[in-house]
Regions:
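Sec-dependent signal peptide recognition
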Residues: 1-7
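Jelly-roll (double-stranded beta-helix
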Residues: 3, 13-203
């Protein structure tokens, strides 16, 4: 009975952990029915234990260190590098501390749906967006991430977005975010003048 009670208490604690955001050092950049996009900085402070309730992906845009504390209290110092991308499944539970004089920074996308929707526009009158001039840097069951260095300009050819997409453009390490619904036809990603851009195609 004591064991069962202890398990129930643990499950209750896990279910009642706060989400990772909002918190000090974060700014919400965009939210709609599909995603929440955050600009995240790891300040030199200890953050509460939290649980990632959504699958999430993103890109770091500065170098930086942080200390990750596991559920069991194990501490590990990690270094992240600017322009590395990532994808993690929901359920990650930990706490974090910024460990750099210049904070690690990144743009995080949280996917609200528990699984990919699989919505794809099949219209063929306009060529589909295929990351032309970009590089496919990561793909998972939830997202395809394209990197453009430099960012696409307004001289690009017209194309159709077959999937919903989040465009993140960086100018002097300042992110700008926009959402492009599937079926959109245009000639550019509104990233002219940016140093680089990332297109996150949502599956």
């Amino acid at each position: 009975m004591r064991f069962i009670a202890a398990v129930l208490v643990l499950l209750f604690q896990i279910e009642n952990l706060p989400p990772p955001y909002p918190r000090d050092g974060t700014t919400k950049l965009l939210e709609n029915d599909r995603v929440i996009v955050w600009d995240v900085s790891w300040l030199q402070q200890a953050y509460p234990v939290h649980r990632h309730v959504y699958d999430y992906a993103g890109v770091y845009y500065t170098n930086g260190d942080r200390i990750i504390v596991s559920e069991r209290g194990a501490r590990s110092r990690t270094t992240s590098v600017a322009w590395d991308t990532f994808f993690f499944r929901r359920g990650v539970t930990h706490s974090e501390e910024g460990a750099s004089d210049d904070p690690l920074r990144g743009v995080f996308l949280e996917f609200k749906e528990p699984a990919a929707l699989g919505v794809v526009d099949t219209e063929t009158t306009t060529p589909a967006f295929a990351g032309t001039a970009g590089r496919n840097v990561r793909e998972s069951e939830r997202v395809v991430i394209w990197e453009f260095v430099p960012a696409p300009d307004t001289a690009s050819s017209p194309h159709r977005h077959t999937r919903d997409a989040v465009v993140v453009a960086f100018t002097k390490l300042k992110p700008r975010v926009s959402f492009v619904p599937h079926g959109t036809v245009h000639a550019d990603e509104q990233t002219a003048g940016a140093d680089r851009a990332y297109v996150f195609e949502l599956k």
